[in-house]
Structures are given as structure tokens and as C-alpha cells.
């Protein structure tokens, strides 16, 4: 392989937009032994996310023991579903599904067959660490939690995601060490926080954004160490509490009016160009404690990484196109949901404590030197789940890599996939609208099909909505516990791109939470609430802009698009404004 010492511009195979490959990118691809990509970063991310089903769950039996499970896999997709206990047990041997490598067919075609044969775990969880938290996914160490995802070490939380060490949080996304939170986003070390965004070390906060070390604030933004403020105006304690009673926070209509007012008020104040601290020469958003990290998103403790996302556990070095997890990783490329002491990984899904893996799925417990394997634990030198000697494996590996480049997989749209490319979506276990791809790259059914994705048609359900959205009681004071027997209609009625379930229920713990904190009932189903909440999160796209502070000439890359209404400052000007 010959690599360039200067930037090259290519046209994406999928979207046909131009993208750049920098000299340092070519050096990374050379180190990994892969061809430079022919898909742009956005389309590569979209394809990886189409293999990530976080929140679309089904009831289906384990195909080994017969027990009913909550599963990520739609029964009609043909994936063999095992419960956690059976999948981790020694009752079966995944190498019995091994198959010979066929040099007369593309590799990804053979991998697609193996995906349908080898049993896969129903959920991505450490099932022994879950207590009364069955209806969850991508979690461990939960107690009494319901419908939360990609979260760890939580108790009594509902309808949330990306939460760590939280208690009594409902409808919350991106939170750490937070207690008693509702309808909030990106909160760290907070207590009693409601309808708020980007807050840290604060308590008793309502409808506020970017507060630090504050308490008893309502509708505020960019405050530091303040208390008893309403829309950034200082009050006495007595006047603050009196004013708070006037807002009628029991009422959904009042809450919606205050939300709108607060969001308009926030637009009068500057935002820092990125969310992040203690970074060196790094670009992206929600990037922390990182060095030389470029175009990455929600990443902590990275070094020389690019196009990465959701690497929330630190110490990740020389990783490209790596989505979710992290923790002591090095030289990872085009991989998903992997981490914890891994290195030299290409095109893998759910690889933990492993090294020298290629195109392997659900690889746990010290695997090494695997190619195209599924559900192996503590194995080495396997190809398509078939065991080889070290010498046989090392002889076959370069032949397979050459074969993948000489006979690439070609999808129905005519797009080619060679060694180094992530799996084609055509062999995914999920439909597009079941996955995180729909969240970050929302499509209609027609758009998805035209782009080569599959789509899950809505299933007819045997229920009748008993209370349509407009008739849901406005004030929690007038709601009895009988509400848990009702089927409520979602306000969106399925007319959105938010995986709307059209109808939903209020659970008993959920009702008790609303009653205890005097909060109105939601008018949207959990999925639509999630999609509305993450509108507070900047997109994983970046633009070159200038600081909007008068007289400042600083430039930066930011996730705030030029046509957005927010005021955006460089770090220096922002800090001068708020500190």
C-alpha cells in the first residue's frame, strides 16, 4: 500500500459528498494495515450506528432454556436469541458453528450467514449485576431501574440513558452522580434539578442552563455560585420562594409556557464554542481531558483519536471511527460498543479484553487473533468460529485480507466493501428505525429504503387508547392512581421520526415520582420524550466559525451551525463573560 504525504479529497461512495483524508490519517491507516476509507465520516458513523439497537426491545424466549426474555432482536430477523445465563454458560460451544472460509465468495457474505447461525445474547448487559431491572439494555449494576439504556451504577431511575451513579432520575440523558432529576440533559453532581441543561454541582434548579455551584435558581443561564435567582435576577430567599409558587409547576400547560420562555431567554447569552475542559489541541464537542483528539463527540481521556464517539471511559489512544465505551484501548478502528483493555481491533462489535481481532462480534474474556467470529470467549486463532493452529491462522490471515480487497462485497446499491470497512448494513441484525442511526441520522421509511437500509413496519397492537393526549389531565393535583390502568395517547400520534409508540402507560413508580415532586404527567411516549430531550445535545457535526464577541478575531471548530440562533464565543471571551 502506498500512502500520500499530503491531503487527498475523495467522493463518498454513499452520499457522494467530498471529504478529506489528511496525512496523519494515512499514517494511521498504514499502521493498521487497511486501505483508506471510501465513505465519508458521517456515512461511516451512520453505518456503525445501524448495528446498535439500544432501545427497541421485544419479548421472546431463550432458544436454549425456553425462558421468556427481553431481547434486542426482533424474532422475524432470524437471530438466535439466548438469555444471559445460557449465553455465558458452558452448555453450548460456539465453535460448533464454525465454517470453512470460502475464497470463492466475498467475506461479508459468509459473515452474514454466521450472524444468523451463532446464538447471541439477548441484551448487552452484565445480567448478574441487575436487580429488578430487566427492561433495560447496555447497562450493568442497576437496582430497581426501568427503561434506561447505556447506563451503569444507578438506582430507582426510569426512562433515561447515559447515566452513571444516579438515583431517582426520570427522563434524564447524560448525567453523573445526580439525584432527583427530571427532564434534564447533561447534569453532573446535581440534586433536585428539573427541565435543565448543562448544569454542574447545583441543586434546586428549574429551567436553567449552564449553571455551576448554584442553588435555588429558576430560568437562569451562565451563573456561577449564585442562589435565589429567577431569569438571572437576584431575589431574597423569601421573595424567591413566593415567586416560585406563582409559576404553577403542577400544570403541563404552565410548564410548556415556561420552557418556551426560558429557551428564548437563554438565546440572549453566549455559549462556549464547545463543551469540554482540560483538552490540548482537540476539536469536537463534549470532549474532556484529551490530547490531540479531532472531530470527536462525547469523549473522555482520548489521545490521538479521530472520528470517535461515546468513549466515556478514559485512556483511549490512536483510535479512529470508534463508537461507544473505551477504557484502556489502543489502535481501534471502525468498531462499536467495545473496550476495557483492547488493542489492535478492526471492524468489531462488543469486543472486551481482547487483542488482534478482526470483524468479530461479542468477543469476551481474553480473546486474541480472531477473524470473523461470533460469541467466542477465551479463544485464539479462529476464523468464522473455526479453530486453527497458530501457524495455520497466520498463514491464512494475509490471504483473507488480500481476498477481501480482490473480491469486495458489493451491496444492492453497488457500493464496495473491502478490508478495513465496517460491516455492510445488509447483514445487520436490526432494521434502521430500531437503531441509534435513526436518532443521529433520522430518515423516513422511503429515505431509508432508498439508501439501502431495511425498515421495521409498525405492528398492529391489541390495545385501545383510553385517554387521548389532549385529554390527559393538565394538573397532577387532579390525577389519581387509577391513571396507571389507562392507555395514554402520545401527542405525536406517530407523525414524527422519533420511534413513536403512539400509546404509552404510566407505571406505578413513575406515578409516585410525579405525585411526590408535584410534576405534571407527560404527554409524549418515552421514545418521543427521549428524542425531544436530546435536541439539547449539539449534533456530531462541526463548522469553522469566528468568535461572535465584538473585537475578537479567534476562530474555532464548533458544533453550533452558522445558521443557529445561539451566540457563540471562544473560550477566552466566554470565560470573561461568566467568571
Where are these regions (language model features)?
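Long, distal/terminal scaffolding or interaction modules
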Residues: 2-579
